[in-house]
A protein has these predicted regions:
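Metallo-beta-lactamase
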Residues: 1-94, 98-110, 117, 122-191, 209-216, ...
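Core dinuclear metal-dependent hydrolase active-site scaffold
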Residues: 4-7, 46-50, 56, 65, ...
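Short glycine/proline- and acidic residue-enriched helix-loop micro-motifs
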Residues: 32-33, 69, 151-160, 232-242
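Active-site flanking residues adjacent to catalytic metal/cofactor-binding acidic residues
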Residues: 58, 105, 125-126, 194, ...
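Catalytic metal-binding/acid-base residues of hydrolase active sites
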Residues: 61-63, 108, 129, 193, ...
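Cap/insert and terminal regions of metallo-dependent hydrolase folds
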Residues: 75-87, 208-253
Length: 253
C-alpha cells in the first residue's frame, strides 16, 4: 500500500502577516526578512489521502464568498465551480460520495463547509474540539458558525443558519477521538492544541516518510524556522503563529 496526499485549495482568505501569521514578538525580526503587514490571501487547503482501502479527506474547506465576507474574513474568494470542495474533487475524478472518511483538524468555519454532500463518510474530530464547538465563548461564535450570529434571514445549510456539522444527517455521523489514534493503517492523528482548544494533526505514512497535515497550527513555513537573530536574542527556535487560544500549547505543538 502506497499512500499519497493531494492538496486541494478551497479558496482564499485575507490575512495580515504581522498580526496573523506571526506572534507580535516576532515583528522586528520578520520585517527584516521583507515581511510587511499588507493583507495577503492565504489559500485554504484541504488534503485528499489516496492509495489505501478507503478514500480520506482532511477538512472540507471554507464557505462560499458571500458568507465568508459577511460573517468571517473579507474579501475572501471561493470561485464557484472551481474552489468549492465538490468541484475540487470532481477535478481529480471523485464525488463527495466517494469519500469514506473526513478527518477534521478542527471545526472552524473555513474547514467544515458542504458536509451534507458527503453522504457516506464517517466524520472524525477531536473530542475536546467537538465539545468546545458547541459551547464556545462569544469571542468564538463566528469561528464556529453558531446560529446566534445569523442576520437577515441568511442560511448556511438547507433553509437554516446552522453550523454545518450540526445538520440533520451529518451530526449523527460524527465520531470523536482523543490522544493519539490510528484511524486506518498508515493514517493517524494526535492532539495539537493551541490554535483552538481541540486542534489535531493528521499523520500520513508515505513512501517518502511521514507527512503532517497540520491545519492551522502552522500558517506559513516561516513559523517553523526562526531567523538567527531571533534565536540569538529571544532564544526562539520557531516563529510562533499569531492566532491562538493558548500560546503555550501552540508553542509546544
Amino acid at each position: 500500500m502506497s499512500l499519497t496526499i493531494r492538496p486541494l485549495n478551497s479558496g482564499y482568505i485575507p490575512t495580515k502577516p504581522l498580526e496573523y501569521w506571526y506572534h507580535f514578538s516576532c515583528k522586528k525580526y520578520v520585517e527584516k526578512m521583507g515581511i510587511t503587514n499588507e493583507s495577503d490571501q492565504l489559500p485554504d487547503m484541504t488534503f485528499l489521502i489516496e492509495g489505501g482501502d478507503q478514500l480520506i479527506l482532511v477538512d472540507t474547506g471554507m464557505s462560499w464568498t458571500e458568507h465568508a465576507d459577511k460573517y468571517h474574513h473579507g474579501p475572501s474568494l471561493q470561485r464557484p465551480g472551481i474552489d468549492d470542495i465538490e468541484s475540487r474533487l470532481a477535478q481529480v475524478g471523485y464525488k463527495p460520495s466517494d469519500v469514506d472518511i473526513v478527518l477534521f483538524t478542527h471545526l472552524h468555519w473555513d474547514h467544515i463547509f458542504y458536509l451534507e454532500k458527503f453522504t457516506k463518510a464517517r466524520f472524525i474530530c477531536n473530542e475536546v474540539e467537538w465539545d468546545y464547538a458547541h459551547n464556545p465563548v462569544p469571542l468564538h461564535y463566528k469561528s464556529y458558525c453558531r446560529p446566534i450570529i445569523a442576520k437577515d434571514g441568511d442560511v448556511t445549510c438547507g433553509n437554516e443558519f446552522i453550523a454545518p456539522y450540526d445538520q440533520e444527517g451529518v451530526k449523527e455521523r460524527f465520531e470523536t477521538v482523543k490522544g493519539e489514534v490510528e484511524i486506518v493503517p498508515g493514517v493517524s492523528v494526535y492532539e495539537s492544541f493551541g490554535h483552538c482548544p481541540g486542534h489535531m494533526t493528521i499523520v500520513v505514512e508515505t513512501e517518502d516518510g511521514p507527512y503532517f497535515c497540520v491545519g492551522d497550527s502552522v500558517f506559513v513555513m516561516g513559523n517553523v524556522d526562526a531567523p538567527q537573530e531571533m534565536q540569538d536574542e529571544l532564544h526562539y527556535d520557531i516563529c510562533p503563529p499569531g492566532r491562538y487560544v493558548d500560546i503555550v500549547a501552540a508553542w509546544q505543538t
